[in-house]
């Protein structure tokens, strides 16, 4: 398959080199989930990992935020190695997945405050930062509402607030709109746009083409654990002579 030239990026915020992850199957055989993927993400860029279910997107992101340890290869986030400096990586990353838990008995404010304390943010810094977060995400009136009483959309906003409370330069979102209705999806995407305007580096996984078109500066398309191609949407359209994004997606992953 044709590929775009891999131009080096100076001082990338995220650099992934031949990153692999394998597991042991029920019979002891090695099952490869991610196979020697390579890509870089520029500071302030919105970068999409695009691919069908089972392509290796979630596993890749979980290695970048140190939830999983790579089987081979290297990756750095904000110049910190995900294997040898996991604590520093976690301090520089906010992670959000579709399954991020919300505690039913804690209020929205208490949950975000708890994560702030876990990150050892001084109380004099934490409160004004939380005030700003709740205002930005339009959550101020829900600060004293318990998690079990929040709507699905508010729970997702709460998860974003928790990911942002330590003001990380890098945000990793794994399928952030999965399972949400159209209105909530739009609200989440609007919030991602606001974060982009604040200079955050964002990498997120999706298989929804409209999310890619609205948000991404560049994408890496994954299939069967490998990166098939990486570039801007315009570059991919030109390379594969296909303007329709849905058709382009099917051509790349089939």
Residue ranges and their predicted role:
Residues 167:
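Conserved catalytic motifs of ABC-family nucleotide-binding domains
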Residues 113, 117, 124-142, 190:
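Conserved ABC ATPase "signature" region
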Residues 146-150:
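Conserved ABC ATPase signature
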Residues 171-174:
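Catalytic Walker B motif of ABC-type/P-loop ATPase nucleotide-binding domains
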């Amino acid at each position: 398959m044709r590929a775009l030239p891999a131009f080096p990026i100076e001082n990338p915020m995220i650099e992934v080199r031949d990153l692999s992850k394998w597991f042991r199957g029920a019979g002891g055989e090695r099952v490869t989930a991610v196979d020697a993927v390579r890509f870089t993400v520029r500071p302030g860029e919105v970068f999409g990992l695009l691919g069908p279910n089972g392509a290796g997107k979630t596993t890749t992101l979980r290695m970048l935020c140190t939830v999983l340890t790579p089987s081979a290869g290297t990756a750095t986030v904000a110049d910190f190695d995900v294997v040898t400096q996991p604590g520093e990586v976690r301090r520089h990353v906010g992670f959000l997945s579709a399954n991020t838990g919300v505690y039913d008995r804690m209020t929205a404010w208490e949950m975000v405050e708890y994560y702030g304390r876990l990150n050892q943010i001084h109380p004099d810094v934490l409160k004004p930062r939380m005030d700003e977060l709740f205002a930005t995400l339009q959550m101020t009136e829900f600060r004293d509402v318990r998690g079990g009483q929040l709507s699905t959309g508010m729970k997702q906003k709460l998860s974003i607030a928790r990911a942002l409370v330590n003001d990380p330069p890098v945000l990793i979102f794994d399928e952030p709109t999965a399972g949400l209705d159209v209105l909530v999806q739009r609200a989440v995407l609007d919030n991602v746009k606001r974060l982009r305007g604040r200079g955050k580096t964002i990498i997120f996984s999706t298989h929804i083409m409209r999310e890619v078109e609205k948000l991404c500066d560049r994408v890496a398309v994954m299939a069967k654990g490998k990166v098939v191609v990486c570039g801007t949407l315009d570059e991919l359209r030109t390379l594969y002579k296909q303007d329709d994004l849905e058709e382009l997606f099917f051509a790349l992953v089939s």
